[in-house]
Amino acid sequence: MRTRQITAMGQGPLVACALVICALGATTAAKAADYPVLRGSQIEDAPPPPPDFGTGSTNWTGFYFGGLAGYSDTNFDVGRGAANIVANHLRSTTIEAEMQASSLLNMPNFSKRNATFGGFAGYNLQFGDVVLGFEADYTHHDAKGTSADAIARSRTLSDGYSTSVWLTGTTAAELKDVGTLRVRAGYAMGAFMPFITGGLAIGNGTVTSTATVRTNGVDADPSEAPVLQSYSSASGLLVSSRKNSTMLGGTVGAGVEALFGGLLLRAEAQYVRMEAQGNVVVETTTARVGAGIKF
């Protein structure tokens, strides 16, 4: 009997130890479930931030240059292209003074479309979101064409003659190159910037005008003279003028640029209006794209 009690008393501490060990094991397993390294990570990677199109993320200040290519529509207003040479030929005559013969010819306008290319360079200064700067560009055009007209008029003039004048005229015009010097204003939108431009334009080209002038006059009252009085230049007189013309005018435009590091990309539209020698007006509208480097 005593032996059983001793045995039972000896087993009690062992059972208690076993219970404590089991409790500690369960607690450790429960805590281990909260450690990602032990149960596998359930935390997803954070999504990348959205692109920053806000202000201040791109520095637009600095010098830049690049090349451009586009397509141009050039209009030549040559209506009075031959007026100067006709006026010079008929200067100090009753025909010019009273009939304004030099204003009679009116050649139709013509347009040419062609690919263009060139380059640009400029400098920007950024003030917060506003970007101001200046830019010079060059565009090679090589647009040309010809227009012609003919007209005849008769009138009794103050000198007593019934006078007739026949005119034919031709004007050929060519636009070779255009350069501009412009100011720019843009609004920075991160890596993108819409902008407007305006400034001066100078063009290089040629204007060639020719005219044939023929006149004839008959005394309006021949009964007062014993012999019929008349004059004529029946064969006509050809006069011409060819000038290497420097064209001067203005330009406006608008576009958008994108800046990625030092790479500059742009798309823009530009309008140029210039006056050439010989009463010729040249207008060109160009859509173009460009790429360059910004420092």
State what each model feature region is.
Residues 2-6, 10-295:
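Gram-negative outer-membrane beta-barrel domains
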